[in-house]
């Protein structure tokens, strides 16, 4: 069973402005400064509660100059993790996938279709907007939504279940702080199922979370070139980020 939401990841513009907004306006703790493991020239900032607990996490890929265009096939609300909202031209295919994931219908209000996990562990709303054009990714858009599972064994069970249902699912990806599988819902939104562990304390103590640029072991040999690229692309001194 899915335990709820694990995290939500958004695209952002200026890296320093993203850090300031999340910490000062959203009042979130920066628990990890790292990079996008699939694109090490892009920062990946994790914000959450004191320990970065699953379900508290909002993460950002900064550096996107083009602004997003709201539209169908996007998550249009959800940075607070309490009410994730998708915009779809046709809600039925997405509703069927949510059913496979264990969500059940929880009511319709106007063009909003609500789905919930048992005991209210997570809620997803689908806005039915049949005439809305497809959205475009860019700064301000949500990149993907991740659901929680307890461990890798349960994650593999979900992967097999989704494949059996005809869903194209990625292999398991090692994200160091958790393991992930990815798939798209019929409208195009990227979903993820992530494990609760190992967590963010594997490479920094609690009091130092988010204080330095952390890289996974397989990227550590390239640290110098990665830091140089980050500085060049984002125009931010690493010392500024540590302040």
Descriptions of predicted regions:
Residues 65-68, 131-134, 198-202:
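A short local loop/turn or secondary-structure capping micro-motif enriched for an aromatic residue
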Residues 11-53, 86-123, 174, 243:
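Core segments of cupin and vicinal oxygen chelate
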Residues 81-159, 163-169:
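Surface-exposed interaction/gating patches
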Residues 147-175, 179-243:
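C-terminal functional regions that serve as terminal interaction/effector modules
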Residues 1-17, 72-95, 138-148, 206-243:
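N-terminal beta-strand motif that seeds the catalytic metal site of vicinal oxygen chelate
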Residues 32-37, 47-71, 77:
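Conserved donor-binding loop and adjoining core beta-sheet/short helix segment
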Residues 5-9, 28, 45, 55-58, ...:
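Short, structured motif recognition centered on aromatic/hydrophobic residues
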């Amino acid at each position: 069973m899915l335990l709820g939401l694990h995290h939500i990841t958004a695209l952002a513009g200026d890296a320093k402005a993203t850090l300031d907004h999340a910490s000062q306006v959203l009042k979130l703790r920066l628990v990890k400064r790292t990079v996008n493991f699939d694109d090490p020239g892009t920062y990946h900032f994790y914000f959450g509660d004191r320990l970065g607990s699953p379900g508290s996490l909002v993460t950002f890929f900064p550096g996107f100059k083009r602004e997003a265009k709201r539209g169908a096939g996007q998550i249009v609300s959800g940075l607070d993790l309490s009410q994730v909202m998708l915009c779809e031209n046709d809600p039925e295919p997405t509703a069927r996938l949510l059913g496979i994931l264990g969500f059940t219908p929880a009511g319709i209000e106007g063009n909003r279709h609500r789905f919930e996990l048992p005991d209210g562990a997570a809620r997803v709303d689908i806005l039915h907007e049949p005439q809305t054009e497809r959205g475009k990714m860019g700064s301000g858009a949500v990149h993907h939504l991740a659901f929680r599972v307890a461990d890798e064994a349960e994650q593999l069970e979900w992967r097999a279940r989704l494949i059996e249902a005809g869903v194209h699912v990625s292999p398991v990806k090692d994200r160091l702080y958790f393991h992930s599988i990815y798939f798209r819902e019929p409208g195009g939104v990227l979903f993820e199922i992530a494990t609760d562990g190992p967590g963010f304390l594997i490479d920094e103590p609690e009091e130092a979370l988010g204080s330095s640029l952390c890289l996974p072991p397989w990227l550590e040999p390239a640290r110098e070139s990665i830091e140089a690229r980050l500085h060049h692309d984002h125009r931010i001194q690493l010392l500024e980020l540590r302040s």
